[in-house]
Amino acid sequence: YGAPTEFRSLGQINEGTIVPLGLANAIDQDDLYVEMTFARVMDTVGLDATTEQYGEMFRDSKYSLWHANAGARRNLSRGIKAPMSGHPDFNVHANDIDFQIESDFVGLMTPGLPQASNHYADRVGRVMNYGDGLYGGMLFGAMYAAAFFETDPHRVVEQGLLAIPAESGYARLVRDVLAWHAQDPADWRKNWRRIEEKWNRGDPCPDGVRVYPAWVPWA
C-alpha cells in the first residue's frame, strides 16, 4: 500500500479502493535494510550494544537513505557520534518518521516483552531521531511485542503508550485518537478530520512533509 500512495494525500482523504501491489524490489526498501543493519549489530556486538556502536555500523552502510536516516549518516561520517547524530542540534530531520518505520524489528525480537522492546528501541532510535521522532518508534516496537499475546487492538495501543512519555505530543495524539474512536467508532472520516484540525500543524522537516496524520494508521 505504501509506495504507490506515499505523500500523495497530504491533508486530504484519498477516496476509492487501494489495490495492494507486490514489490519486486522489497530488499531495496529502507524500512527493511536499515533494520537488517541494526539486527546485525545485535548479532555481532551483542545485546548490550550501545547507541554509539549502532551508529558505527550505520555510518559504514552504502545503501540509499532519506530524511533523518540520511542526516544521521552524514553526521556520523563527519565525526558526530550517536546519539548526537540524531539530535535536532545536528539533524534537522530528528522529528521525522524514520525510526517508526524501522522499529518493528525490535518488537519482533522481543515477543510479549514490550519493556525489553523499549530498552532496545531507546538505544537504536537515537542514532537518527529525537523526541517524538524517537517516541514513534518506541511505541510501535512495544505494540509489536505486545501483539504476540494480546488480541485486543485497543489494549495493544495502550501497551505502546506505556513505552513513551505521557506528556509527549505523540502520546497526547494517540490518546486523542483512542478517545475519538470511542466517541464515533463507525465514522473514521470524522475522526480523520479531528486529527487534521488539531494535529496537522507545521513540522520542522525542511522538506515540508506533514507527518503527524501518518502516525495514526489505526484511526
Give the predicted meaning of each segment:
Residues 1-35, 54:
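An N-terminal structural lobe/cap that precedes and organizes the functional/catalytic core
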Residues 14, 18, 40, 56-59, ...:
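Short, surface-exposed, charged/polar-biased interaction segments
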Residues 36-37, 138, 215-216:
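A generic alpha-helix surface/boundary motif
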Residues 1-17, 128-149, 154-155, 219:
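Catalytic phosphate/nucleotide-handling subdomain of diverse soluble enzymes
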Residues 77, 84-94, 103-113, 122-127, ...:
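Accessory "access/gating" subregions that flank catalytic or transport cores
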